Regions:
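N-terminal glycine-rich FAD/FM-binding segment characteristic of electron-transfer flavoproteins
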Residues: 1-248
Length: 248
């Protein structure tokens, strides 16, 4: 059984992204880039399933500029067997990414698709759902627990106020939530060994997918700065202030 795991190269979660002064975009020149944290969780889950003997091959895939190779090498160091880089300098919408994944899947025929629940740069939370729709495959988004059997996958999903458990026929599309697992730390020897693992290159044209952007960004803005708080000396003073502000 094969798993296809999508890993996106995004601005590292520790970086505070600034908006350009003209509001046309965000300034990410020279900032640290990393694998999308939810995708690390997706890779980790695939590796655990392989270690448990449930799947035999993990293929990591990333779409975007040349530097996505670094992200794929990290996935290989974590335990993926081989990687596919769909190289393009165009900006990719979730729908285009889903179409590219579908095009690759036609050749790869995976039983399980593992994605992150959202990319922390665009926060779209759309790709897994769109891919499932394009493939006409069942989806288990926001996965918190995954149990893989021969013909089905049992997924416990995070939903408002609790969890929901679904049994999905294979092939199925899953998206990882935070509680699914804690990704392993990548050790240097594994990174070195990952350099020898196969990394295949392709591009949207070869896959027959037109990169079209149906989204137009109107403007970017910094979130409003929060007003400073105020310390009060007593409960009575707090109540008086709340009354004066007509909050109670
Ligand atoms: P999004 O729908 O943009 O929030 O992304 C959800 C998930 O889709 C991510 O966590 C990745 O697993 C996958 N994904 C999105 N864009 C890419 C990309 N350019 N390359 C690889 N995977 C991607």
């Amino acid at each position: 059984m094969k798993a296809l795991v999508a890993v996106k190269r995004v601005v590292d979660y520790n970086v505070k992204v600034r908006v350009k002064t003209d509001g046309s975009d965000v300034d990410i020149g020279n900032v640290k880039m990393s694998m999308n944290p939810f995708d690390e969780i997706a890779v980790e889950e695939a590796v655990r399933l392989k270690e448990a003997g449930k799947i035999s091959e993990i293929v990591a895939i990333s779409m975007g500029e040349k530097k996505c190779e670094d992200t794929l090498r990290t996935a290989l160091a974590m335990g993926a067997d081989r990687a596919i880089h769909v190289e393009t300098d165009e900006s990719l919408s979730p729908l285009t990414v889903a179409k590219l994944l579908k095009a690759v899947a036609e050749k790869e025929q995976p039983s399980l698709y593992l994605l992150g629940k959202q990319a922390i740069d665009d926060d779209a939370n759309q790709t897994a759902q769109m891919l499932a729709a394009l493939l006409n495959a069942p989806q288990g988004t926001f996965a918190a627990k995954v149990e893989l059997n021969d013909n089905e996958v049992i997924v416990t999903r995070e939903i408002d106020g609790g969890t929901e458990t679904l049994a999905l026929n294979l092939p199925a599309v899953l998206s990882s939530d935070l509680r699914l697992n804690e990704p392993r730390f990548v050790k240097l020897p594994n990174l070195m060994a990952a350099k020898k693992k196969p990394l295949e290159k392709t591009n949207p044209e070869q896959l027959g997918v037109a990169v079209e952007n149906r989204l137009q960004t109107v403007k970017y803005a910094e979130p409003k700065t929060r007003q400073a708080g105020e310390k009060v000396a007593s409960v009575a003073e707090l109540v008086a202030k709340l009354k004066a502000a007509k909050a109670i």
